[in-house]
Amino acid sequence: MDLQSLASSIPQDTLLVILAYALLGGLYLLVVPLALFFWMNSRWTRMGKIERLLVYGLVFLFFPGMVVFAPFLNFRLSGQGDN
């Protein structure tokens, strides 16, 4: 059974639901956490109180995706540690 016949045997509504879940899952686990990582890296020393509170809330909300990328991304502040 090839992929074409398998896809045609599944109802279209089911395929749309699977696509929606994949899209939302990718957004939740990949896109937003990466954007949040880079936003925090670029704004860390210039954030105001409200922005920092919002960012901490987003980190809490998107924590599973942040954990996925945490071992691979390391944004240390410049000038700290051994060079």
From Swiss-Prot:
Keyword Transmembrane: yes
EC number: 7.1.1.-
InterPro entries listed in its UniProt record: NADH-quinone_OxRdatse_su_L
Domain of life: Bacteria
Transmembrane segments: 18-38, 53-73
Compartment annotation: Cellular thylakoid membrane
Gene Ontology cellular-component annotations: plasma membrane-derived thylakoid membrane
Known partners and oligomeric status: NDH-1 can be composed of about 15 different subunits; different subcomplexes with different compositions have been identified which probably have different functions.
Protein name: NAD(P)H-quinone oxidoreductase subunit L
Record organism: Parasynechococcus marenigrum (strain WH8102)
Gene designation per UniProt: ndhL
